[in-house]
Amino acid sequence: MKMVFRWYGEGNDSVTLEQIRQIPGVEGIVWALHHQPPGEEWPLEEILEVKRQCEQHGFHIEVVESVNIHEDIKLGLPTRDLYIEKYKRTIENLAKAGVKVICYNFMPVFDWLRTDLYKKAPDGSTALFYEHAKVHTIDPFALVDQIAKHPEFTMPGWEPERLEHLTRLFEAYQNVTEEDLWSHLHYFLERIIPTAARCGIKMAIHPDDPPWPVFGLPRIMTSGESIGRLLQLVDHPANGVTLCSGSLGANPENDISAMIHAYADRIPFAHIRNVKVYENGDFIETSHRTKDGTVDICGIVKAYHETGFSGYVRPDHGRHIWDEKCRPGYGLYDRALGIMYLWGIWDSLNREKQEASKCLKSMKI
């Protein structure tokens, strides 16, 4: 597996490239042009500037997260073709800079949802938290105001230019069903996958976070079954998945290791993180350690190892520890700890494989 690390750019992240390069085994930066609104073409010169910055510190920029999709595409409006053409030009520009994977999502309005950005744990750390009952009772606009109280860093999917149109967007999605959303995703993929394939880029959709409908908005990327359906919409290696163990793991019924075995050749990018799910449906993000959450991180890494996974992996959201001031979920310390935990499992599996091979050779002798 190729270890990468998400970075929000110069002046937009508490973590520096110099710090990231000190984490063992990190070879690339997961990045985006976060100031570019959804639907706009990414200028090649801006892409190349990020490449220059990262390469100065020894990193590649082969994974982009995310090239956000304009809501008109998700809504299936007549204007979607204009935005799809811009998206295709962005794919072409990214290919010119050496990008290999584009992570994106097809979630209406909100890219992800939490009710608390700094929920305190018994050990004194804080983490992203989802209170199931609260989502069913709170006004979505009140939740937006609550999230907006933390202006230190813009949260992906919660950009001010997106949230200022919240009322209009909720009205627009009022009659959009899950099947409508599937149809609109199919339309989008049929038009961009040929471009991605020609450019040598793999599109990797991110599961919905959390993996169920929120505020009456449809969600469709929620399970192994939905991943299978997505891959059949356009059955091509360029149409893939960003398998996120934290997003899918919020539903304990999702068997993530089984998904890895089923779709291994269509997973170019993996997010590995843990969550602790409570009986009432609440969940909190934990350390990456298997014992600390509900998700079997050891089993997931083993599944990647068994399938010969050679794609990109990043530690996903971390806790906020040691008084670090950072973008919620995206500090340095806990994600660095997560990387070392993942490497520990991976190296152990490599050692087991080597020992087994030696044993077989000695038996033949």
Swiss-Prot record:
Pathway: Carbohydrate metabolism; pentose and glucuronate interconversion. It holds the Pfam family UxuA. The keyword Cytoplasm does not apply. The keyword Acyltransferase does not apply. GO terms for molecular function: ferrous iron binding; manganese ion binding; mannonate dehydratase activity. Its EC number is 4.2.1.8. GO terms for biological process: D-glucuronate catabolic process. It comes from the Bacteria. Its cofactor is Fe(2+); Mn(2+). It catalyses: D-mannonate = 2-dehydro-3-deoxy-D-gluconate + H2O. Keywords: Iron, Lyase, Manganese. Catalyzes the dehydration of D-mannonate. Belongs to the mannonate dehydratase family. HAMAP family: UxuA (MF_00106). PANTHER family: MANNONATE DEHYDRATASE. This is Mannonate dehydratase 1. It comes from Bacillus licheniformis (strain ATCC 14580 / DSM 13 / JCM 2505 / CCUG 7422 / NBRC 12200 / NCIMB 9375 / NCTC 10341 / NRRL NRS-1264 / Gibson 46). The lineage of its organism: Bacteria, Bacillati, Bacillota, Bacilli, Bacillales. The gene is uxuA1.
